[in-house]
Design a protein with these regions (language model features):
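Amphipathic alpha-helical surface "interface" segments used
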Residues: 40-48, 127-142
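His/Asp/Glu-rich mid-to-C-terminal helical/loop segments that flank catalytic regions of hydrolases
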Residues: 64-135, 148
Length: 149
């Protein structure tokens, strides 16, 4: 099912979010931050190992504003899934799931990847990001790892 939004875990940390914002706008969609940052998803996701090394990485998640559904429908479905299935034996694709919105997400992520690949410079962390220092050191060639004996 298509959404009018896309959740970005850690939204606002890097210039990748600017790429995501532009791509989402072209699709007539918006970005929204993680609704539950206190759960630490940013620090538990696959992209975190890139971030720890100073490499900006995008962590997209499904939106919650489903086209043609009441405003709270997506959040209710997410909560229902988390309670009943998340990390349980039943955590599998269900035959009644409508995955057509995944095409929009895949196209958005492809646009981002293409634009990053065509850009003149690598995406950077934004001021205030805890990973910016590591990236700045890396780009200068003076990271603590490279200076080790």
């Amino acid at each position: 099912m298509a959404t009018a939004d896309l959740t970005v875990i850690g939204l606002g940390n890097s210039e990748l979010d600017d790429y995501a914002q532009a791509a989402a706008a072209e699709q007539g969609r918006s970005l929204r931050p993680d609704a539950e940052p206190e759960k630490g998803f940013y620090y538990r996701s696959d992209h975190f190992n890139f971030a720890k090394q100073g490499v900006p990485a995008l962590d997209p998640d499904s939106g919650v504003e489903y086209v043609g559904k009441p405003a709270d429908w997506g959040a209710k479905k997410r909560d229902e899934y988390t309670e009943k299935d998340y990390h349980k034996v039943s955590d599998e694709i269900k035959p009644d799931w409508d995955l057509t919105g995944a095409v929009d997400d895949a196209q958005l992520l492809t646009m981002i990847g293409y634009r990053v690949a065509q850009a003149d410079k690598y995406p950077e962390w934004k001021a205030g990001s805890e990973f910016k220092i590591k990236r700045d050191e890396m780009m200068k060639g003076t990271s603590s790892r490279s200076s080790m004996p």
